[in-house]
Amino acid sequence: MPDIRAAETTNARPVLTPWVEAAVPYLADLSVKPVTYNPPVGTGTPRRDGNYRDFKVRIHDARPIARDLSLDHQAFILAQHATAVRDFYDHDEIRRTYEPEVEALIKRETGASKVVVFDHTIRAADRGVERGHRAPVRSVHNDYTEKSGPQRVRDLLPPDEAEARLKKRFVEINVWRNVSHDPVEMAPLGFVDSQSIAPRDVAVCDLIYADRTGEIYIGVYNADHRWYYFPKMTRDEAALIKCYDSMKDGRARFSLHSAFDDPTSPKNPKPRESIETRTLAFFD
């Protein structure tokens, strides 16, 4: 079982805040091995095996307690982060402008000595597949497992550097941002407080691609999970999600997250457009 518990501290359990009720897709049980089959981007939607079921949960507004959140306790935070990017659909501008911005953000928030930005995913809630982008993920999950976390380091770094880095602390953090000039109204992202996740609450899910197989954690339903979100995120905000931490000293090692339908959204909400950037943060 993964070791995910955070240390109990005076600020480890934030007070509960106003909430909405929404359905999120969990694994109901482990009667069927979870597997997700991913076609190339723009060619179709993923197909998944597993006994998934929608469960209604209370998702609390995290804005009133944003300053109390920590990557080492809850495993997600909200950061104020203005960007100079004009067009997030321009891959050259992403590489030239946004990657250095994200690298600086991760260093600022974690104190990491080196940050590697290695992947971007644009998600569009309105006809995302037709436009060659992915739709928001409606599944309670975490992007890495105990196995795939270290493997990502080996995949991305030269062999000698990878093995040296694996001997020290490293963290995998996703940076999630609204790329529209309007606040998010459709399919916001919800997060589970890491401290409310028990080891039995996650299952390994195989990710099948045309050229490789990976794995992530899928959430198994637990009524004790504490859910949060940041309503109406703007273009100058970024959510940081810790997806893997090599340290096993009591700090939070990862969280769970999923898109959901916010019942307070307008009747005809503006389609969500977002970018999720994956990073590796290394510490000396």
Predicted regions mapped to residue ranges:
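Short, low-complexity, intrinsically disordered N-terminal peptides in bacterial proteins
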Residues: 1-7
